[in-house]
């Protein structure tokens, strides 16, 4: 029964993750389509650049909840922790490859943030401190995300966090979505967080 419940939540997490906060909010409020403007990435940073910080905050909260809600649901049904990590991965894959938007989505950072925060407050603290500090020092949102998930990877490996391999897999998925950002950072072509 637990395995059946976990499987249903894993599937639900993908479909929930596929709902794009930026596209939905922009359509509802009649703002420009983030897929057609700026970096053309339907994520929080692009919304910050092409619209404003208030809408970006709503998108961040929406996309974070997509990761958190399935985890909370799994916790409510007392499923094994290993399934919680699979649920987190499923939600992020839904965000990155959304079935509702021709499998073209964001990078999964906010959704991963929500999922990991729902799993442990320690992840919340690490992510917030690392991201804010990195962006404050270097002014690149993408670098903040890259450094954050590298730190998460080493953290769970170093302390041998239970089922840490799933969290490392999640981090690698997020990092793989930043390959173009890494190239631009290397070539000094990446835009600062506030640059349009």
UniProtKB/Swiss-Prot annotation:
Entry EC no(s): 2.3.1.275
Alphabetical UniProt keywords: Cell inner membrane, Cell membrane, Lipid biosynthesis, Lipid metabolism, Membrane, Phospholipid biosynthesis, Phospholipid metabolism, Transferase, Transmembrane, Transmembrane helix
Localisation: Cell inner membrane
Function: Catalyzes the transfer of an acyl group from acyl-phosphate (acyl-PO(4)) to glycerol-3-phosphate (G3P) to form lysophosphatidic acid (LPA). This enzyme utilizes acyl-phosphate as fatty acyl donor, but not acyl-CoA or acyl-ACP.
Membrane topology value: Multi-pass membrane protein
GO BP, sorted A to Z: phospholipid biosynthetic process
Quaternary structure, from the entry: Probably interacts with PlsX.
Chief subcellular location: membrane
Superkingdom in the source lineage: Bacteria
Protein's pathway: Lipid metabolism; phospholipid metabolism
GO molecular function, one term: acyl-phosphate glycerol-3-phosphate acyltransferase activity
Coiled-coil residue spans: none
Reaction catalyzed: an acyl phosphate + sn-glycerol 3-phosphate = a 1-acyl-sn-glycero-3-phosphate + phosphate
Gene Ontology CC, one term: plasma membrane
PANTHER family: GLYCEROL-3-PHOSPHATE ACYLTRANSFERASE-RELATED (PTHR30309:SF0), INNER MEMBRANE PROTEIN YGIH (PTHR30309)
Protein name: Glycerol-3-phosphate acyltransferase
Enzyme class: transferase
TM spans (from-to): 1-21, 55-75, 81-101, 118-138, 140-160
Family the entry assigns: Belongs to the PlsY family.
Pfam families the record matches: G3P_acyltransf
